[in-house]
Amino acid sequence: MFKGGEKMEKEQRTYDETLEQHEDAQSEQAPEEQVEQVENEATQQEEKDELTVAYEKIAQLEAKLAETENRFLRLHADFDNYRRRVRLDMEAAEKYRAQSLVSDLLPILDNFERALQVQVEDEKAKLLLQGMEMVYRSLIEALKKEGVEAIESVGKPFDPHVHQAVMQVDDQNYEPNTVVEEFQKGYKLKDRVIRPAMVKVNQ
């Protein structure tokens, strides 16, 4: 009977010791797990912070890239416009290269036309006028080759782009706003008016 009780006490002590060791082991492991969890959370937070910083840097770089692209596009457009203006200026210079010469020749044409309208009876004077007319026609042909042409006026509707009204009349024989007389010829070089025609216009 005594032996049986002693055996039970021994088993009870063994159980208690085992339980105590288990509890000690748990109490020893718990702080380590907590430390590991804290470290993991800290690591995750650091990674999150680093990722946030990286995203911010990426956003800044993308903004700078967009700004650089926009500036490049503006510069490219400005250069294209500049190149187009230069080309147009060169084309205009080539197209209207004779403008200065033509402007200087117009008064000479006017003098030829006034001289050719003079009525003469003397044969020598007639021969002189014939020679002048030949020179005049040669000059007109040379100017035509450069694109110079006289502006039509009499009987045409008044056009302020090519006509300069210096007088107005009320003539029932003409439609209103019609050129009835030309005082001085106007000329165009290709599509550019070198000198408008001086005209009389019906009201």
From Swiss-Prot:
Residues 1-25 have a biased composition (Basic and acidic residues). GO terms for molecular function: adenyl-nucleotide exchange factor activity; protein homodimerization activity; protein-folding chaperone binding; unfolded protein binding. Residues 1-49 are annotated as: Disordered. It holds the Pfam family GrpE. GO terms for cellular component: cytoplasm. Keywords: Chaperone, Cytoplasm, Stress response. It comes from the Bacteria. It is found in: Cytoplasm. Residues 30-39 have a biased composition (Acidic residues). Belongs to the GrpE family. Participates actively in the response to hyperosmotic and heat shock by preventing the aggregation of stress-denatured proteins, in association with DnaK and GrpE. It is the nucleotide exchange factor for DnaK and may function as a thermosensor. Unfolded proteins bind initially to DnaJ; upon interaction with the DnaJ-bound protein, DnaK hydrolyzes its bound ATP, resulting in the formation of a stable complex. GrpE releases ADP from DnaK; ATP binding to DnaK triggers the release of the substrate protein, thus completing the reaction cycle. HAMAP family: GrpE. PANTHER family: GRPE PROTEIN, GRPE PROTEIN HOMOLOG, MITOCHONDRIAL. This is Protein GrpE.
